[in-house]
Amino acid sequence: EYSGKLYATWMHDKGSYADFVLQAGRYEQELEGFDNTGMDKSKADYGTWGFGASVEVGHMFSFDSGVDDRRWFNHWFVEPQLQLSYFLAKGADYTTSTGLKVDQGNADFLTGRAGFVLGKKFNYGTSDDLDRRYFQVALLGGVKHEFLGGDQTISYTGVDGAKASVHAGDIDGTRFYYGVNCDWQVTDNFRLYAQASREEGDRYTKDYDISIGGKLLF
């Protein structure tokens, strides 16, 4: 599995921002199970592409004694956020080791999110200099709603020519998420981040997801 993302960010000195993301990835799958007789194992492997885009907007409200307008300065903050994202998982055609032909359709996801981040920034410099480096730790939470649900049709053709199809997906609905993250602005143009979060809601539970990475601005 490998993927890439392109980011574009607009930021205002007073705390407003907008993030734009495009992504594409290749996802390899390996399947193993028993055929309809329950006697022979059936195996298959295939690859498929995925494409996505998202827009996120928000505003950071700073509060603390002696709070500074500069968003990197030492302070507590709360940041409401809104996001809309779309992802297309392309279908695939493949044949299992027992000769079963599978035609897997595309799956579409449209997800809306409303959330917040509550945290504390610790700046490197003082109020008298322009050092924009900082370290941040924060709690996050909110609600997500899946509008399309990833509905997908999968058709099967057996070695005897018999056909069948099933409808998969049904993950639309509302779920809640919560977690913690850390940000370290190493330089003006480079930032490291780590996040752990969990989701649960309608017919869906996602155990703790941990991500670590970096962002280079240019």
Name each model feature, range by range.
Residues 1-218:
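Membrane translocator/pore-forming domains, dominated by Gram-negative outer-membrane beta-barrels
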